[in-house]
A protein has these predicted regions:
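Amide-donor transfer/coupling interface in amidating biosynthetic enzymes
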Residues: 4-30, 55, 60, 65-215
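Catalytic nucleophile loop
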Residues: 22-49, 163
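Short polar/charged helix/loop
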Residues: 52
Length: 215
């Protein structure tokens, strides 16, 4: 992670060293993106900070037994697996995110900003202080967790806190459940039609940028 952070600092610039010219200035359209830890690394490298534990620092919950009492829409991993030994429990959570008024998702990715897609999350850290070079593009259901960021200057520097790359989102695989009373289901079946469409549009945007840069 130290290597990644140093590389991103030199690439994107940082409030931690304002005298250093970002390497990105030589090619402002170059794409840099990331998922989960990638978003966190980009934010820290550029001068932001992290919550080290979401349940404890954001929701004032100190143990798994109280973590699971938090509204499921606002959990970013599954703490039932720390309470009960059940091989069917998924270690992650599927929850909705909301888009901000930033133009990234609405005009760049071209999805409705009113959409609240279901996403795959597996993390306990999150952005606390946002690096000044970024805008927030998405938030958790209650608005407390930053779910997406985009660079204010470089159009192809963006990242999300969730995991759109997980192949089980796009086809039926193992049956899993979040809570003891849930009926086991595939991750793919947990996505509604609009959520699946969102994931495909997001990948479509990434593919478009890569194709343009390969010309």
């Amino acid at each position: 992670h130290v290597f990644n952070g140093n590389f991103l600092l030199h690439l994107l610039g940082s409030t931690r060293n304002v005298t250093r010219k970002p390497l990105h200035e030589e090619n402002p359209g170059y794409m840099v993106t990331g998922f989960c830890l990638g978003l966190q690394s980009m934010n820290v490298a550029a001068g932001g900070t992290l919550w080290q534990d979401i349940p404890a620092q954001v929701y004032e919950s100190t143990k798994p037994e109280t973590h699971v009492l938090i509204n499921r829409k606002n959990l970013h991993r599954n703490y039932w697996q720390n309470i009960r030994d059940d091989k069917d429990f998924m270690g992650i959570n599927m929850h909705p995110v909301s888009f901000t008024d930033d133009m990234f998702f609405g005009k760049t990715v071209k999805v409705s900003r009113k959409m609240q897609p279901i996403v795959y999350s597996s993390h306990h850290q999150a952005i606390n202080e946002l690096a000044p070079v970024f805008n927030v593009t998405a938030r958790s259901d209650d608005g407390k967790i930053i779910e997406g960021i985009a660079h204010k200057k470089y159009p192809n520097v963006f990242s999300v806190q969730f995991h759109p790359e997980v192949s089980a989102l796009y086809e039926d695989r193992a049956l899993v459940r979040f809570a003891p009373d849930d009926t086991p289901a595939t991750l793919h079946s947990m996505l509604d039609k609009k959520s699946l469409q969102f994931h495909k549009k997001y990948w479509g945007h990434i593919s478009k940028v890569i194709a343009e840069q390969a010309r």
